[in-house]
Amino acid sequence: MGKNVVVLGTQWGDEGKGKIVDLLTEQAKYVVRYQGGHNAGHTLVIDGEKTVLHLIPSGILRDNVKCIIGNGVVVAPDALMKEINMLKGRGVPVEERLLISEACPLILPFHCALDIAREKARGNQAIGTTGRGIGPAYEDKVSRRGLRIGDLFNAELFATKLQEVMKYHNFMLTEYYKVEAVDYQQTLDDALAIADYLKSMCTDVSEMLDVARKAGEPILFEGAQGTLLDIDHGTYPFVTSSNTTAGGVATGSGFGPRHLDYVLGIMKAYTTRVGAGPFPTELANEIGDYIGEKGQEFGATTGRKRRPGWLDAVAMRRAVQINSVSGFCLTKLDVLDGLKEVKICVGYQYADGTVSKVTPLAAEGYDLVTPIYETMPGWSETTFGATTIEQLPPAAINYIKRLEELLETPIDIISTGPDRNETMILVNPFK
């Protein structure tokens, strides 16, 4: 029987999931997105050519791989079409490889307008959303007024539903946020214009995955964002609007949780965060600047500068706990090359001297803690492009071993550069 593997981020996103998914899809027959939307940014570098995907699964560049967008993903038709056209322009036969659940909620222009208006109204309390309508679209889903891809296939009914929901949202835009209303007719026309095209790619995702599983075909589930941004388990309210954890696979694709064989947690050798929110190990100094510049830490979706910091083992233990991580992939180890010392956060200390090895459950709790660091020797030698453990300097190996001890979880894959071949697979998740 084939294995079913989940690849997800264990930090605040931007861990390097896209490259690892692309690498592992060589062994998969299906690659499935199960949450998030085009707020994700997965960067692939193949033979020096860079491709950034926001909505379509990273396996789309592989022959003989079916890419699936599950029901847990919110889909902006314009963003989807832009990505499809970009890939087709590069000669990728998207229609032959991509399948979509018709239960996916739609992101429409009024969702984006609401997202932007809310962030502006929050002022200094802004969450740091991408402004792409993700949160408002999930709100509509939960409130049971949302429109789904399947609604597009009945034009008359879609028009009626759209009119009702737009009355509600345009009232909020004009009367509360004091901004312009979104045009109903334009929204309707634009959505219906691609209905037939989308219909040709729609399928019953849960049924398809069940058939594939029973046939022994390996399936890879591609997470977006990261564990610490999970709507329930992240640094609330500075979180995304979906379940970014392994539990999201079942709800976002209809694949039974008992059939998952391996959870691969992607973890950078340091930590970054983009946008607002607590970050105990943040480095607002020269070392942080060094890491940020060397790691080219700019958001793939927004281009915003990411906030760098030391690796937080306390937060990573929480990620292991929530996701039942089988093994880690450590990425961007080479970014730490040249540092005299590297630090790992091993605990949090409160003002009264109390030490905790557990993360707070809400964002406010992080204001009360100071990170406790364990300092290790750095290394001057390069790790860039290393493909065997023996090629790594002893100090880098010790750093890896210490992380395994602290997290009580093996590091099964190590990434030492952006390209596919700059990777060492110590344990193959599919074997």
Curated annotation (Swiss-Prot):
Transmembrane segments: none
Pfam families (alphabetical): Adenylsucc_synt
Cellular localization per UniProt: Cytoplasm
EC number(s) recorded for this UniProt protein: 6.3.4.4
Cellular component aspect of the GO annotation: cytoplasm
Name recorded for this polypeptide: Adenylosuccinate synthetase
Organism annotation: Shewanella frigidimarina (strain NCIMB 400)
Electron transport in keyword set: no
Cofactor note: Binds 1 Mg(2+) ion per subunit.
SUPFAM superfamilies with a match to the protein in the record: P-loop containing nucleoside triphosphate hydrolases
